[in-house]
Amino acid sequence: MATIKDVAKMAGVSTTTVSHVINKTRHVADETKQTVLDAIKALNYSPSAVARSLKVNTTKSIGMVVTTSETPYFAEIIHAVEEQCYRQGYSLFLCNTQNDPDKLKNHLEMLAKKRVDGVLVMCSEYKDDSRDLLKSFSYLPIVIMDWGPVNPDTDLILDNSFEGGYLAGKHLVDNGHKKIGYLSAELTKVTAKQRYQGFIKALSEANVEMKSEWLFEGSFEPEDGYECMNRLLALEDRPTAVFCCNDIMALGAISAITEKGYRVPDDFSVIGYDNVHSSRFFAPPLTTIHQSKARLGERALRLLFERIAHKDAKRETIEIHPELVIRKSVKKIA
């Protein structure tokens, strides 16, 4: 593998001149510059990214730590972030934690050793030790992309799950539903709890009370939506509509409904959350709460770049508001 010394020898210049040509740190005569570039091409020389980063104090790389890259919601956000990084000339290191604090610690240590310019963190739940861990990496520019720990050492993007839950509940009561169930992820998770609280507020404003037996907890997976809906269908007194904590749970719920010979929305109305790309192709197309994954990725990355440029500036919290997307899975009743 060619070195900078090999390039300098072939071009008949010093290694310092080669460095200036590569890093554009000083004017070099056009003829000399072309000679160096020709030597680089002939030798197939690739500058050391680490060595270059030490000179210019940037690696043009970003770390992203997520719970998982497999679920549609996370996958779409990761795609949006990667697209924004590419346009800005940055590389993206993706790390999955599965909500394991040890993995979070190891990933952050690895990213710090790779001298990434900053880190985006998006995990579905933050335990106390995770909060303390993030504080110990306060020397890294970090942006939290969801309902994470609010502390003075990190910037934060909030998706306002409370407002989204409220929009879902209000849409159902506005369509005449008074018997409404909720298929939730574990209510110990902040996002699920916030969506539930917003949902209950909308029902309360309309003087609609949700029976406790119509609340089922699972996880953010289709299997849990399917299982919870089957338990709901087994009840004698059943709701006319259900709010699912995310679109993937709604997919499982719709599958359970159709397997029992019922139809959506004729027999049961279903509303989801997230507006993942595939939700428009559900049968029927899913009414859901939209969170712009592209906007979330863009805002988070922009905030991170601002933090990288101004490390001592006051930490910011930016709120992104969800929107209702009406399709064909909710029926208006008298």
From Swiss-Prot:
DNA-binding in keyword set: yes
Q: Which residues bind hypoxanthine?
A: 73, 189, 191, 220, 274
> Which CDD domains does the record associate with it?
HTH_LacI, PBP1_PurR
Note the Pfam families from the entry.
LacI (PF00356), Peripla_BP_3 (PF13377)
Transcription as a keyword of this entry, yes or no, is yes
Query: Where does this protein bind DNA?
Result: 4-23, 48-56
Q: Which Gene3D superfamilies match?
A: 3.40.50.2300, lambda repressor-like DNA-binding domains
A Gene Ontology MF term for this entry? DNA-binding transcription factor activity
Name its GO BP terms in alphabetical order.
negative regulation of DNA-templated transcription; purine nucleotide biosynthetic process
- Keyword terms: DNA-binding, Purine biosynthesis, Repressor, Transcription, Transcription regulation
Q: Where is the HTH lacI-type domain?
A: 2-56
Alphabetical list of PROSITE patterns matching this protein: HTH_LACI_1, HTH_LACI_2
Q: Which InterPro entries match?
A: HTH_LacI, LacI/GalR-like_sensor, Lambda_DNA-bd_dom_sf, Peripla_BP_I, Tscrpt_reg_HTH_PurR
Recorded metabolic or biological pathway in which this protein acts: Purine metabolism; purine nucleotide biosynthesis [regulation]
Q: Could you say which residues form the signal peptide? A: none
**Purpose of the protein:** Is the main repressor of the genes involved in the de novo synthesis of purine nucleotides, regulating purB, purC, purEK, purF, purHD, purL, purMN and guaBA expression. PurR is allosterically activated to bind its cognate DNA by binding the purine corepressors, hypoxanthine or guanine, thereby effecting transcription repression.
Specify the protein name.
Answer: HTH-type transcriptional repressor PurR
Organism in which the protein naturally occurs: Mannheimia succiniciproducens (strain KCTC 0769BP / MBEL55E)
Gene that encodes it: purR
